[in-house]
Amino acid sequence: VIPKVFYTADLSESPDRQRLTAWKHAWQTLHPEWDVVTFTLETRPPILNHDQWQQTLDLSEPAASAARLNLLRYEVLAREGGVFVDPDRLPLRSLDELVAGVGAFCSTIASHGASRPHMLSPSVLGATRNHPMLWHAIRDLPHSVLVYRGVWDQSGPGFLTRVVRDHGHFRDVVPFHWAMFEQGEEPAKAHGGAFGFVTAKAAEVVA
């Protein structure tokens, strides 16, 4: 069973604590029985892929924070289980039904160029503790960072898609197809979506 705990993080040098507070409130409101945890550089747990973490210090923003977020995401979920969500995603409905019936799930992304029309995305990623997919991700990540260029392919959607495909996890990781990400609450609801983007003027989207 996927533990009922949500995680997110702002791993920039100057975290936006107001946004983290809004994020925590949004997820807690729709999931009153869940724990909600936020991390910053000061509070994040130790990272197994330490060398890859150190390499992110040479990147510019927002790539640096995005790379660190992915490193943290896979390791926290592997050790603890739960649901790790990007800090720019807010819920439009409860996830209770979904986590009750699966061992792992991930969001999807519609496109990233004509050559890759549909990919898995770690933006919303949930799993039981010690799920093999996550340990495969942790093991494969150093090679991915060495071989590929850009956060997308090193640790993001391109990477997660390869891990699930190459290790046969398409049998036990549920693509969260209806979790369509839209710029605003109403478009997301119209498509049956579960989440919306947080924008500068809409940090309170918590319907």
Language-model region placement:
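Glycosyltransferase-associated regions of secretory-pathway enzymes
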Residues: 1-69, 85-207
